[in-house]
């Protein structure tokens, strides 16, 4: 990043709102090491749009960070890091649809991309709106949540993208704001078109149902912080059913945990990263872990599983690649 680019950021966003050499540990769930070369907190979707547009239009290398709960950043000292804390949630409209001769009161909820998934779930529950209760146990924000189509499979209704009606994005190539429909995202479990396009989500509109809810509060996060160590959520996605049958996994489970256990029964550790001995599809990170340690562990497990079981595991963690393009 050049001095001229820094001046452009300061004049556009406010010299009092940009920070230099800001430690990432204060802004990421995993307390990552390293410092952002230039740091800006986008408190509203308008802030986010302004920051992203100025970066794109001036070829400033940047990345957008939510809660950092399942994202790993590396080599950020020369990048412009935008911390997205926009969190407006509002009812955007009501309508009634007829399904199987029954009326369903539907509601449209507009949400800023920096809103916490758990906060969105609680808002809906408080308002008597059902459909997103499964988000209670999922960390992170709406932006990365849609980028990765998070949820609790195998039920498709427990995937965030299923409920999306439309969204506001910024085109990564042109810097222009666009309104897109659900079809634009090409959702699959754990996937969306945003992973390819790297477009930036500003806000989303979800179509939900206003009905009484069952008790949703029993769901809890798979993420824990204990004794100075941090446990990630699931690292790899479920394997295919055909592979579970071929390998005769116990109860035909699709979780790769038992397969990883076979190659890591004696413990797998790379510096500050080790495989959990209670859930083998999870990593335990100590305070001195490095992002590259996580990447190396993922590559090691993929290689060993492919060699032993002829399966190509798919990563669920988001190893964010920063780029000005």
Please name every model-derived segment:
Residues 20, 26, 71, 170-304, ...:
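Phosphate/pyrophosphate- and phosphate-bearing ligand-binding catalytic cores of soluble enzymes
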Residues 23, 29, 116, 141-142, ...:
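Short, structural beta-strand-to-alpha-helix junction motif
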Residues 30-33, 57, 64-65, 72-74, ...:
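Solvent-exposed alpha-helices and their adjacent loops that cap or buttress functional pockets
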Residues 45-50, 54-61, 87-146, 155:
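FAD-binding glycine-rich core of flavoenzymes that anchor FAD
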């Amino acid at each position: 990043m050049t001095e001229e680019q820094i001046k452009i950021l300061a004049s556009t966003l406010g010299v009092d709102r940009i920070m230099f050499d800001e430690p990432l540990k204060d802004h990421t769930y995993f307390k990552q090491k390293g410092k952002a070369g230039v740091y800006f907190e986008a408190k509203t979707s308008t802030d986010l749009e302004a920051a992203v547009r100025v970066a794109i239009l001036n070829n400033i290398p940047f990345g957008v960070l939510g809660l950092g709960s399942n994202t790993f950043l590396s080599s950020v000292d020369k990048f412009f890091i935008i911390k997205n804390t926009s969190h407006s949630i509002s009812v955007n409209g009501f309508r009634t649809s007829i399904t199987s001769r029954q009326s369903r009161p539907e509601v449209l909820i507009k949400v800023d991309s920096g809103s916490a998934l758990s906060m969105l779930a609680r808002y809906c529950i408080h308002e008597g709106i059902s459909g997103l209760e499964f988000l209670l146990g999922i960390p992170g924000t709406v932006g990365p949540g849609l980028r990765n189509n998070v949820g609790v499979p195998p039920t498709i209704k427990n995937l965030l993208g299923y409920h999306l009606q439309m969204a506001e994005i910024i085109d990564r190539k042109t810097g222009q704001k666009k309104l897109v429909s659900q079809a634009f995202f090409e959702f699959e479990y754990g996937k969306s078109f945003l992973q390819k396009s790297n477009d930036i989500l500003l806000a989303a509109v979800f179509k939900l149902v206003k009905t009484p809810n069952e008790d949703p509060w029993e769901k809890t996060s798979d993420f824990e912080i204990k004794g100075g160590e941090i446990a990630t959520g699931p690292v790899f996605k479920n394997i295919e059913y055909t592979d579970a049958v071929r390998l005769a996994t116990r109860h035909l489970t699709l979780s790769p945990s038992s397969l990883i256990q076979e190659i890591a029964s004696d413990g797998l550790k790379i510096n500050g990263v080790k495989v959990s001995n209670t859930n083998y599809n999870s990593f335990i990170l100590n305070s001195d872990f490095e992002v590259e340690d996580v990447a190396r562990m993922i590559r090691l497990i993929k290689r060993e599983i492919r060699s032993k079981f002829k399966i190509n595991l798919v990563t669920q963690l988001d190893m964010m690649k920063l780029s000005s393009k």
